């Protein structure tokens, strides 16, 4: 299926930038060593492949998912074959002693890329998953930044999100705080990041869910009032690699997308997706009707859909890659904007936040409100959008 046509574009967004920089990109990658953390997820595997095809000296991939690593290797071997350099994967947790031992015995890396994250807004639905989100998005980044600095790596790259700009949910807030910790480390190691939008058909995404619903003869459900920007998986890998190699210290890369041309509702993508499969959407009134019709309608060329306004916690009404007051470079690259950051952070507040969260964790008795209180200390203007409803309560 042509992902570009589904998201309303005709060409790869970063094609011109890649073509202009690819000679330098190949020279740098082929003479460098890379560690990709979280490298078997959708974005991680995309950037891993972008590195692999440029023949790095060493490429190590760490991911907590053994199954995803197996598929990554199968995918790479089947599509690209082999490289002259050292390519290995490791099914280990970055917070573990095994990861520390790997770094101690690896000989170091020129570039460390961290793609691991809990990315779903729904992960704030309970205090336990929420705490793991903070651990993964903030503290594992803080830990591996320190380790990359100790290894004398040239650059550390980590993924932020458009939701970190004026966050309204705790996932976005966690990434905004991650940026603050990264700025603190930027005094010892060069750091660059990327903020980007939804990656079409990435694992767990709503578009990925469309595929699964069709496979299982289940109805398609989507909000009809939420407009989002989309990148293809390949574009996500390209953006990350370009930021890694060409980003200056504290740069945050983001795609230049036009809200009048590139914002699209999930319900519109659902209609296009179904049309590609030869179906017309049949609009249902409720979940029960949609479930019943999913077993009988498709054979007649119709597919049951439930499109309704979003009413769950943390859904942002609009997307933005930067906020008022951030300094921008819109000239350096053709289809990538850059947020230029100074080393603005309050080290004392970051340490208090870290210690308070770790104390909550050791207490075994924290609440979502406890976490929110600490987040507000670091982001006083955090406009948390709480409705009391979560996506897990809906189809």
Listing of model-derived features with the role each one plays in the protein:
Residues 43:
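Hydrophobic/small residue at the entry helix of a nucleotide-binding pocket
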Residues 40:
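Conserved glycine-rich cofactor-binding loop
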Residues 9-32:
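A short, basic/flexible loop-to-alpha-helix module at the beginning of a structural domain
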Residues 46, 50-56, 61, 77, ...:
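NAD(P)H-binding glycine-rich loop region in Rossmannoid oxidoreductase-like domains
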Residues 80-96:
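Rossmann-fold cofactor-recognition segment
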Residues 114, 118-176, 184:
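Conserved Rossmann-fold NAD(P)-dependent oxidoreductase catalytic core, especially the SDR/UDP-sugar
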């Amino acid at each position: 299926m042509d992902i570009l046509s589904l998201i309303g574009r005709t060409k790869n967004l970063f094609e011109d930038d890649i073509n202009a920089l690819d000679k330098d990109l190949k020279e740098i990658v082929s003479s460098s060593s890379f560690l990709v953390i979280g490298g078997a997820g959708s974005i991680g595997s995309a950037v891993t492949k972008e590195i692999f095809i440029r023949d790095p000296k060493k490429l190590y991939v760490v991911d907590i998912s053994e199954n995803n690593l197996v598929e990554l290797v199968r995918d790479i071997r089947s599509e690209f074959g082999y490289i002259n350099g050292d390519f290995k994967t490791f099914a280990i947790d970055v917070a573990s002693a095994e990861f520390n031992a790997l770094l101690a015995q690896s000989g170091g890396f020129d570039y460390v890329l961290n793609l691991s994250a809990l990315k779903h807004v729904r992960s704030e639905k309970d205090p336990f998953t929420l705490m793991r989100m903070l651990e993964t998005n903030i503290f594992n980044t803080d830990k591996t930044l320190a380790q990359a600095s100790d290894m004398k790596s040239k650059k550390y790259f980590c993924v932020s999100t458009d939701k970190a700009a004026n966050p309204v949910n705790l996932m976005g807030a966690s990434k905004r705080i991650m940026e603050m910790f990264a700025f603190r480390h930027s005094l010892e190691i060069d750091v660059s990041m990327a903020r980007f939008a939804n990656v079409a058909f990435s694992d767990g995404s709503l578009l990925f869910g469309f595929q699964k619903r069709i496979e299982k003869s289940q109805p398609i459900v989507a909000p009809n009032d939420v407009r989002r920007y989309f990148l293809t998986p390949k574009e996500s890998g390209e953006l990350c690699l370009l930021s890694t190699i060409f980003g200056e210290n504290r740069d945050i890369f983001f795609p230049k997308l036009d809200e009048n041309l590139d914002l699209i509702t999930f319900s519109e993508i659902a209609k296009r997706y179904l049309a590609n499969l030869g179906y017309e959407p049949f609009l249902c009134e409720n979940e029960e009707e949609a479930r019943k019709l999913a077993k009988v309608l498709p054979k007649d060329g119709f597919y049951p859909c439930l499109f309704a306004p979003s009413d769950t916690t943390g859904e942002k009404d609009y997307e933005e890659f930067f906020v008022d007051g951030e300094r921008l470079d819109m000239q350096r690259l053709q289809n990538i904007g850059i947020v230029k950051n100074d080393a603005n952070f309050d080290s004392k507040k970051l340490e208090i936040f870290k210690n308070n969260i770790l104390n909550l964790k050791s207490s075994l008795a924290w609440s979502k409100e406890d976490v929110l209180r600490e987040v507000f200390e670091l982001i006083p203007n955090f406009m948390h959008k709480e409705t009391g409803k979560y996506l897990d309560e809906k189809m």
